[in-house]
Amino acid sequence: RESLLHEMYFSEKPRLAELTVRYEALRCDIMQQYYMNKDYDNVIRIATSLDIHDDADPNASCLVYYYKAQAYVKLENYPMAKEAFFREFELRKKYLGWEEEDTILACQNLGVLYSFCNEREEALACFREAYGHEVKKNGEDSEMAQKLLQYISVVES
């Protein structure tokens, strides 16, 4: 009897894993709807409870951290927002690389928050790093490169 239960469990395990991924994706969609409806407490509640594995779906994880960070910003909880933006940036850098424009944008977002919190050195480091990668990717005349130069100029002044 134990063998039969063991066999049933392991034969269903891939299906359970697939259902879990689908369920978590649905919860991500719900979290985004809460964000659009400005229900930031529920965004944070769902983002905190999601069981997403960074290595399985880095894009989904990055989105969760992004919306979580934005919700914390809207609620003016900047320390938690910094943590979430930093996590999003680190994941994008690790799994997607600097070739992805979203990685540069995540670095910029983190810099903006550092700047807002008067953490000038951290902000400058983010802006300069993002600028360097943006110039390599799209040249110094790109719109993003120009925006990053403006951020650097403002923080330096």
Give the label of every model feature segment.
Residues 1-157:
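Intrinsic-disorder-linked linear interaction elements in eukaryotic regulatory proteins
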